[in-house]
Amino acid sequence: MATYSTNEFRSGLKIMLDGEPCAILESEFVKPGKGQAFARVRIRKLISGKLLEKTFKSTDSVESADVMDMNLTYLYNDGEFWHFMNNETFEQLAADEKAVGDNAKWLVEQAECILTLWNGQPISVTPPNFVELEITDTDPGLKGDTAGTGGKPATLNTGAVVKVPLFVQIGEVIKVDTRSGEYVSRVK
């Protein structure tokens, strides 16, 4: 398996640390005036989701993680597993609640998602950056009621709650940024 030296660290690189695959979020290579150079790294463990800050000497090397990102289409949820399909081979994969996590509220049938696999098992699911969802419940926006923040909570058809502008009504379809969970626009 490939190894990376500390000067090859960059954001998004997947490495093995303590027997668990991790993704590097930030990497800073430091050359002090006196002493040995080192790399200061922020890491997210892909299975547990924990954030770590770790320092590596410039002479250290780490093993690359044997993880694979695949673009798959979300099919359905059977109550226990979320099912995805590879559009080229039509092979289906099932991800459990631990792999899907909080992203379940952004999964829409037929949406292209990124599944991260480790040893053939899904360890994380990344929904598309933007999804279009229907509003199932929100307070009515009264004309002239613009005092305050100018927003109201709205429940979407997946169960997610998003802050939307006052003019948005029940039954309308809106575009939501899944990375921040914020309203982007109305869909015509």
From Swiss-Prot:
The UniProt record lists the keyword Protein biosynthesis: yes
GO cellular component, as recorded: cytoplasm
The keyword Kinase belongs to this UniProt entry's keyword annotation: no
Alphabetical GO biological process terms: peptide biosynthetic process
Highest taxon of the lineage: Bacteria
Matches recorded under InterPro entries: Elong-fact-P_C, NA-bd_OB-fold, Rib_uL2_dom2, Transl_elong_fac_P/YeiP, Transl_elong_KOW-like, Transl_elong_P/YeiP_cen, Transl_elong_P/YeiP_CS, Transl_elongation_fac_P
PTM annotation, UniProt: May be beta-lysylated on the epsilon-amino group of Lys-34 by the combined action of EpmA and EpmB, and then hydroxylated on the C5 position of the same residue by EpmC (if this protein is present). Lysylation is critical for the stimulatory effect of EF-P on peptide-bond formation. The lysylation moiety may extend toward the peptidyltransferase center and stabilize the terminal 3-CCA end of the tRNA. Hydroxylation of the C5 position on Lys-34 may allow additional potential stabilizing hydrogen-bond interactions with the P-tRNA.
GO MF assignments: translation elongation factor activity
Subcellular location: Cytoplasm
N6-(3,6-diaminohexanoyl)-5-hydroxylysine sites (modified residues): K34
Pfam families xref list: EFP, EFP_N, Elong-fact-P_C
Pathway given in the UniProt record: Protein biosynthesis; polypeptide chain elongation
Keywords: Cytoplasm, Elongation factor, Hydroxylation, Protein biosynthesis
Principal localisation: cytoplasm
Entry similarity comment: Belongs to the elongation factor P family.
Stated role: Involved in peptide bond synthesis. Alleviates ribosome stalling that occurs when 3 or more consecutive Pro residues or the sequence PPG is present in a protein, possibly by augmenting the peptidyl transferase activity of the ribosome. Modification of Lys-34 is required for alleviation.
Name of the molecule in the record: Elongation factor P
Gene: efp
